[in-house]
Amino acid sequence: MTSIARRTLLAGGLAVAAASLAPVALAAPAQPWLAYERRLRGLLADPPDGDFDEDFEQTLLDLNNLIRRREGAPPLAWDPGLAAAARAHAADMAVTERFDHLTREGYSPAGRVGLLARDLVGAPAENIAMRRNADGAVRPDQIMNQWRDSPGHRANLVAPSFTHVGYGVLRQGPRVIAVGAYAEVAARLAGPAPLRVRGPDEIARALSNAAPPIRQFSVSEPGGEVLTVTYVEGRPPNVLRPGAWQLRPHLSSGEHRYQLGWGPVFVLE
């Protein structure tokens, strides 16, 4: 289980100044991130030695919401971008035989969600499981019970702040690899953000019709916490170095107060 479901709080009038006092964020190299995105989309189109099981995935959602109802937590809604991130990681683990939240290259759930859920602003988390029964096919309740009986995984199942989920289940003969991608969705873009951009103004345009409105944002290295402030509505955008970045929108949480969310990964060319 992994979770980065956290948002940094900024005082509105001090948001730019406070972030500028932090160490300067560095862009990640662009080509590895572009290659990872291609790899994930290729796995979605052609899963290795098996197929994605949509019925299994939907049953996991039903079982998860049953657990949440018993705990007094609101139900989770299905999100196709989160489901894409979950499916892609399940297939990637099947290829690499590395069953972890981090790939060998160090790509995290935040990076996967940022690459594939391109209209989502939120705080992601992830559960993973692999199972092969001695007799009979693996069932959804067996995977859900594995997570329910693990404190860390259970925390993601019942976290009241999470609003959306996508499950990815790859069935390879008797083996099932399952991934749950969870998020507290704080905002939606009107459409998918572009992966490749020429400047911060293109990202600002992608945010222009977000709901609720996003009028300023920072960026970090994908999955990173060190920020560079690049845009405040009505001010000229700051210069940003080429490379891979992750959008960190400033979400209003009251008068003159903002929280930093997690948004799409983009490559500045």
Task: Label every PLM stretch briefly.
Residues 25-27:
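Boundary at the C-terminal end of the N-terminal hydrophobic targeting segment
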Residues 109-184, 221-222, 236-250:
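A well-ordered secondary-structure block
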Residues 183-191:
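Short domain-boundary/entry signatures in modular proteins, especially
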